[in-house]
Amino acid sequence: MNTRMMFARAVAGAAMVLLTNCAWGASSADWFPVSVGLTMARPIPPFPCDNVAGLSLCLLSGEDCPVYGLQASCLSGCAESIYGVQIGAGYQCADDVYGLQIGGANVTTNLRGVQVGGLNAMRGYGLQVGAWNIVDETSFAVQIGVMNSHFWKMDASQSSARSLQVGIANRADGGSRLQIGGFNLSDDGSCFQIGLLNFHNGWITPLLGWSSK
């Protein structure tokens, strides 16, 4: 799946979730269509910071609860899960993100979608666009940025991860990957590199590098 299609599907999915769940949330006793607060601990009546199906708006920081729709914050947003869009000027975090995450720094332990920001860190499947992109464990990722990192805590030879990295500096350990950039580093696993200098399994080569290990 190419980058444009992945991004388009994430945005379309976020919009669909936002539209369909607003009406559902309004009619549910356990969910609220709108949530407004200064922080997660200081909601503004009559808009509780609780389970949200629609719009979650916090002036300082978002609340730690599930959000189906849009969560927007001036500084930072935190949520148990996001099904839609999470956006803010500062730090954005969520356990699960199914959709789009936009912020100065974005962190999630389970991504199915897109991250756009200065710093992006995730586990899961998706696209990262930012200055520094970080992926952990057996993720399937497309990383576009100044610096891209793909790390493994497990035995790299047993990793099933796949990644495409496009940036000035790219690093990946284990799995299989395609690296395109100025400087590419690959410690283990199979790789194909296109760049000014390519470091792979103890070798240093200009322009092209590859390994089937």
Where in this protein do the model-derived segments appear?
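Bacterial N-terminal signal peptides that target proteins for export
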Residues: N2-A12
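Bacterial N-terminal signal peptides
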Residues: A10-N21
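Surface-exposed, glycine- and small/polar-enriched segments that build interaction surfaces at terminal
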Residues: G25-K213
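Low-complexity intrinsically disordered segments
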Residues: N2-T3, V17, S160
